[in-house]
Amino acid sequence: RLVYAANSRHALHDPAGIPVEVGALLGQSQPVAASLDAVADALDGGGCRIVLDASASEAVAERHADWLARGIHVVTACKLGQGGPLARWASIQAARRRGGACYGDSATVGAGLPILRSLRELQAGGDRIHAVAGVLSGSLAWLFHHYDGLRPFSNFVRAARDAGYTEPDPRDDLSGEDVRRKLLILARTAGHALESDAVQVDSLVPPALRDAPVAAFDDALPVLDAPMRERFAAAYKGGAKLRLVARLQAGGRATVGLEALAADDPLAIGGGTDNRVAIWSDRYSERPLVIQGPGAGAQVTA
């Protein structure tokens, strides 16, 4: 049963159980102030104790290790735990072992796709991971699948934003920072304990616009048109396709950037907002293991 539900401002607590439709209830009938300290207290008692973190909060991610150490299972789509500072990641691993609790992080990369599970099961079976590469952003997958080099790139960015594929501030997607966190999670899961700044990111946002107000960035979006048209033309001339690719190479080198891929490359195939990941290992050395499917959406993520 659900005994505690909270957003950033309000909380509901009832040991007898709360109706699942808590979204509407949190703004009604005398909710109490939300407190992260109250979460573990609300779960005192017997039975299977689980915290479901559907936030994107650094403060909540900082509590993951504490909950795990208390034997409370954590299920999350938040990338700030596994994809945050290395010390936080390490504390989560240690707390999970110490508390005997499970850390359900599959949805942090690829929504409902079995990407992290596959990496773990390969290694548990004695395989060694050599490299991982992927298209890990549904919004950027949509953007570069539809961009045709004829219409302005800025038009496609606005269309993706208006359709809800990007964040309200498209720089959150175009900067590659979200993909960087996902690649960190993949790398650490594959056995490379990388520091947060170890991933080299080639941002699509010009330096002059990285700190501009959202409205000013929207007005300045056309500055992306000419350089993107040139990159598209060069790729098209060679029969290639542009994709924003995250790569973990042998030795742990990690990069995120726009690449021109051969049309038959497993990362170039597919459309829409699909995520695609290729895994090379001892057993998948000549042809990679490829995982593909929807990388976003409430139902598959849940």
Q: Language model features by range: what are they?
A:
Residues 97-100, 104-166, 177, 185:
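Rossmann-like NAD(P)H-binding beta-loop-alpha module
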